[in-house]
Amino acid sequence: MTLSIQSLASIAIELQSGLTQRDRFQRLINSLRSLLRCDASALLRFEGQQFRPLAIDGLAQDVLGRRFALDAHPRLEAIARAGGVVRFPADSELPDPYDGLIPGHDQLKVHACIGLPLFAEQDLIGALTFDSLDPMQFDRFSDEELRLISALAAGALNNALLVEALERQALSPLASPGGSSPRENDEIIGLSSVMQQLKQEISIVAGSELNVLITGETGVGKELVVRAIHQGSARAANPLVYLNCAALPESVAESELFGHVKGAFTGAIQHRAGKFEMADNGTLFLDEIGELSLSLQAKLLRVIQYGDLQRVGDDRVKRVNVRILAATNRDLKQAAVDGAFRLDLYHRLSVFPLAVPPLRERVSDIALLAGYFCERCRIKLGLMQLTLSVQALSALEQYSWPGNIRELEHSIYRAAILARAEQSSSELQLLPAHFTIKAGALPARIIDDALPESAIGVSLATLTQHFQRSVIEKTLVECEMNWAATARKLELDSGNLHRLAKRLNMK
């Protein structure tokens, strides 16, 4: 037996040390990599037909953000279906999910791999994977020894999952124990301290019945926060209804919110329920709530206060039971002071405010997010491998990301498409040249991109119009074609922006 009692005892000790579960898992992985003398090790959690890395050693940092779906990774599927130790021969035809993800060996294939499924009774809860560039590295370890390691890790992971479930129930006692199954791509990615704090606050407020105001810049992921709150609440089995207030023309906004009866106005050919009725006993997400008119804010306040609403054209009162989650990228408190937003409505909504940090304040999460989007992009484009070079990741971490996570996602996809056209291969590595971003301030990039390649013989007036049109177009895309948000970002009056757009033949 190659593994000594002392070695196994040291593993058990590592599982009891550390201040947090994350720290314990990292210590475990570090110890196992040293013990087995391999090049890479990983502890994965199994949920929703995919593996999620909890701790890694010897792998690129962006692996922590990747989600390995079974149907896209045959090696991991083989581990999930196995009842014990899985050894992959060095010449295995099954692609290794970590190919190209061992730093310093970007172009070198992983040679030897073993996988240990982790079970709690009969349920698969995770896996351990070990990889080595030496094809013979794992031959000296018996299956019995590896099963002992598996048993220790499975017990630790199962205990962690039980503690997590108990903590979640303690923080949200009104939430249903099982909760609802998250939709694909609903996960909030991030291990930075600000994101850990945000996740903690979400867990606290989710099981309550409080209305929540979620603030943050465009593209930070406010809708993901909304979904996390809804899924962690007692209303999770009931509807989550979405309404973008900024996209509502004033003439139809009241009908969209409260519904209407047949004949209430021209075109009302039948009765129609509004968003409040659709969300009865569930949750209503009011995105960009700061764009509602003051008159509609007054009617919204009444429904929030008393649960009473009237369809347009109807004298009858309906009662609804709806939880409000509102989001905005505006400073509503200042808007209330300025008279642009009702102060009483602001206080009703902001009982438990949540602020989602911009990406520039969580730089340590960029690698995880980049890995997450690389894996999704790899699957969508049908690639065998999609990795980031060290230089590319460094460039991503130095950029200010004014469009936040949404801009990062679009940049990854655009870079992958450029790389595929250039390399004509199913195994791609993204380089700095594949990204159109530049480290530092945004204005320089905008100026470079907005002006034509040659300005010789072009009048200053024409150049000015070209520049204005380009900047407005780029900002519109960043703001998801939201003119009101675009005006705020460009620090323009909304009416002036619309007039300028018409003058530039953009409307």
Curated annotation (Swiss-Prot):
PROSITE patterns: SIGMA54_INTERACT_1 (PS00675), SIGMA54_INTERACT_2 (PS00676), SIGMA54_INTERACT_3 (PS00688), SIGMA54_INTERACT_4 (PS50045). The gene is norR. Signal peptide: none annotated. Residues 188-417 form the Sigma-54 factor interaction domain. Required for the expression of anaerobic nitric oxide (NO) reductase, acts as a transcriptional activator for at least the norVW operon. Activation also requires sigma-54. The modification 4-aspartylphosphate is found at residue 57. ATP binds at residues 216-223, 279-288. Pathway: Nitrogen metabolism; nitric oxide reduction. This is Anaerobic nitric oxide reductase transcription regulator NorR. Keywords: ATP-binding, DNA-binding, Nucleotide-binding, Phosphoprotein, Transcription, Transcription regulation. One of its GO terms (molecular function) is ATP binding. GO terms for biological process: phosphorelay signal transduction system. The keyword DNA-binding applies. Residues 483-502 bind DNA. Disulfide bonds: none annotated. Pfam families: GAF (PF01590), Sigma54_activat (PF00158).
